[in-house]
Amino acid sequence: GRVHTCLDSCGYAFDPQHPEKFDAVLNETDMVLLDIKHADPVEHKKLTGCDPARILAFGDEIARRKIKVVIRHVVVPGITDTVEECEKLGRLIAPWHNVVGLEMLPYHTMGVVKYEQLGIPYKLEGVPQMDTARMPELRNAVMAGMKKRRAELKNAIG
């Protein structure tokens, strides 16, 4: 039988000016695990140092190709842990009808030691681990934002 493939990416390498550069990979991809760090473009840039436009263009491209996608989102205390932020994420991904899953990942501090050992400054220094008890509420907020936005899009079309 055929080998199934899954691409785990934030999509930042995608070049929206030349989507054909990704044909070789995407033509063989069955599913994408797409990491979205923040729903707000300005906050995304502050958090990651990267403009999210390429990531969103990658999301649009895999939606156009009807490749299944699982959205992965790390919930960081004080940054992405509000109902409002999670609703924004839902609204952001709503146009993508290829979304088959949503993984809300609670931020943890297990990687801090690696950064210290390598002498690399850790951007989230002092941020506590995420309270996992809040995860269902925040996941529901993403789903609610997605549902609201899809209803708006449907009504706009007619």
Residue ranges and their predicted role:
Residues 77-158:
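Auxiliary Fe-S-binding modules of radical SAM enzymes
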Residues 1-110:
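Conserved AdoMet/S-adenosylmethionine-binding subsite of the radical SAM
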